[in-house]
Amino acid sequence: MSDHRLTNIVKSLPASIPFVAPEEHERIVGKKFSARLGANENCYGPSPKVLEAIKNLSVDIWKYPDPTAHDLKKVLANFYNIPDNNIVIGEGIDALLGYLVRLFVQVGDNVVTSNGSYPTFNYHVEGFGGQLFKCDYLNDKEDLQSLIDTASKTKAKLVYISN
């Protein structure tokens, strides 16, 4: 494939796969996993109440949902006692992290995170032209002092702390 239409940022990125899906790992090892914990799934599946709610809502599945998620935001705002304009609804963590980076990181901006944090966050930073600085863990935990020091030294625009 010719890359003459790609942006310079995309052309400069190394070929990489930011996240290897559980299905790909299963193909590599030749068997299904009994628990896919890395995919944030539990081995019990959804509760019967969730299955019933999905079944009841499935009659309208053919309709596009409200793109503003108005009703969901109102329910969450009431539950957490915060303004609904403080809530962002997205189609998953990858997209939400992409929005975060897109909102705050311009070409050349410095961003600090830890080695081993969420892989697609790094992908978004590099994909939008940010400069990524990674800190090692300390005793299998985020090294907060290293993150703070690196952010200060690099004048980072954004610091991502994973949980």
Predicted regions and their residues:
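N-terminal "arm"/small-domain region of PLP-dependent enzymes with the aminotransferase-like
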Residues: 1-63, 161
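Conserved core of the PLP fold type I
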Residues: 62-163
